[in-house]
Amino acid sequence: MAEMTVELVAVEQRLWSGSATLVSAQTTEGEIGIMPGHEPVLGQLIEGGTVSITPVDGERIVAAVHGGFLSVTATTVTILAESADMAQDIDVEAAKAVLAENSGDLEAIAVAKGQLRAVERA
């Protein structure tokens, strides 16, 4: 089966790197699915979105991302997020509390919604 190299990087750290058969991400142009051999593209990730990676040899990886970019070549996908949280590391109750308490903080709301969306997709 064809595969591609994928890197998921946030400003603070590299979250995941390896070979995958599918990447899907939410961009400002809509949700995009990328398989090996995809046409080159550069996309802007939405605030409070998710990225899903299907590794060659493992369970699907899901992360909540808050802004950033997605760069695709025929053999490589690089996801550069302003911030990101792996779904398994997200505190669901804390994210729900942010939604309940921060009705005026749009950035905090977007991050919390993205975190909950990532947990649902994982």
Curated annotation (Swiss-Prot):
CDD domains membership: F1-ATPase_delta (cd12152)
Membrane topology: Peripheral membrane protein
Annotated Gene Ontology cellular component terms: plasma membrane; proton-transporting ATP synthase complex
Annotated compartments: Cell membrane
GO molecular function annotation: ATP binding; proton-transporting ATP synthase activity, rotational mechanism
InterPro entries (UniProt xref): ATP_synth_F1_dsu/esu, ATP_synth_F1_dsu/esu_N, ATPsynth_dsu/esu_N
Record keywords, A-Z: ATP synthesis, Cell membrane, CF(1), Hydrogen ion transport, Ion transport, Membrane, Transport
Subunit structure: F-type ATPases have 2 components, CF(1) - the catalytic core - and CF(0) - the membrane proton channel. CF(1) has five subunits: alpha(3), beta(3), gamma(1), delta(1), epsilon(1). CF(0) has three main subunits: a, b and c.
Function, in words: Produces ATP from ADP in the presence of a proton gradient across the membrane.
Similarity comment text for this entry: Belongs to the ATPase epsilon chain family.
Protein name: ATP synthase epsilon chain
Organism phylogeny: Bacteria, Bacillati, Actinomycetota, Actinomycetes, Mycobacteriales
